[in-house]
Amino acid sequence: MHATVFGNTQIQKDPTNNAIPHKLIERLTGLKRNQDIYNYQVSHIWGHTKNPFFFEAPWNICCTPKLMDPFTGHESKGICPEEYQKIFFAKAYSLYAPFLEDYESMIQDYDMENQIKRYVQSLRGRKEERVLNQFERDALSEWKSI
């Protein structure tokens, strides 16, 4: 899809799904996990980890104390996590608004929703319908507005 939409054939999958964000934090801060900082985990603020613009974006990556994981994890449920996440996302949005606005402009300029639908349509008859439908749902979710 990225080759079709963006003309980019150089996107590679992170083998651990977190090695690149860890290296990015280390490069930007000079701090190494389990050497300079302990009991923290590298997390994606808004998720969208299958979207290359979000996966490596410094404004979507943070170090979170492991103690806070019950409040920040995507599987967290309940009133306390909901309240914490509301405050956390509001603060993150206020810090990174210019970058998020750039992203919003980009997905509008590229008309990502229609690009995804056209790409999936181009594969109809060559791929299993069930697989295409799941891919379309996942891609639309990954490329949606924040």
What spans do the regions from the language model cover?
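Short, charged surface segments at domain edges that flank catalytic/cofactor-binding sites
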Residues: M1-K32
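Generic structural signal of hydrophobic/aromatic residues within well-ordered alpha-helices
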Residues: H2, P21-L28, Y84-Q85, I116-Y119, ...
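Histidine-centered nuclease catalytic patch
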Residues: K23-C63, D69-K77
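Short, structured coil/loop segments at alpha-helix boundaries
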Residues: N51, P65, P81-Q85, G125-N133, ...
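Polybasic, low-complexity binding patches
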Residues: F54-F55, F71-Q115
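Short leucine-rich amphipathic alpha-helical surface patches
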Residues: M68-D69, L100, L123, K127
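C-terminal, well-folded lobe of enzymatic/effector domains
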Residues: S105-I146
